């Protein structure tokens, strides 16, 4: 029987393959990003304790107030969101992370997010 959505199935397979290699620890937690059609979501996770240290989304009122955007579905919003996440992570004392792209291609919004976070001093 064929899978209903081959693109989604392939992304999940890529994500499992990536997760075998990308592990967050207390010194370098994992920065996981999920792009939906209209928004972006990011979490900083310590995999050894299985705890989410910080979570962010473009739906948050704080981000929408700073950016003036209602949706985070484009590259410009991804750049602003990457800077926002890096600043908030620094406030929590997190400066080094392991980047988890979640099986999505390192292109477009994912690349813009990562480059903006690096510009603000988040190292990965």
Regions found by a protein language model. Give the residues of each.
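Ribosome large-subunit tunnel/peptidyl-transferase-proximal elements
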Residues: 2-124
């Amino acid at each position: 029987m064929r899978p209903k959505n081959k693109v989604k199935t392939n992304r999940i397979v890529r994500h499992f393959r990536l997760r075998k290699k990308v592990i967050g620890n207390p010194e370098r937690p994992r920065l996981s990003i999920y792009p939906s059609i209209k928004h972006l979501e990011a979490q900083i996770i310590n995999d050894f304790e299985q705890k989410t240290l910080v979570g962010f989304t473009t739906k948050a009122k704080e981000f929408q107030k700073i950016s003036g955007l209602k949706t985070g579905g484009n590259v410009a919003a991804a750049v602003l969101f990457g800077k926002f996440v890096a600043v908030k992570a620094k406030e929590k004392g997190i400066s080094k992370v392991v980047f988890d792209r979640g099986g999505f291609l390192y292109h477009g919004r994912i690349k813009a997010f990562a480059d903006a976070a690096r510009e603000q001093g988040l190292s990965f």
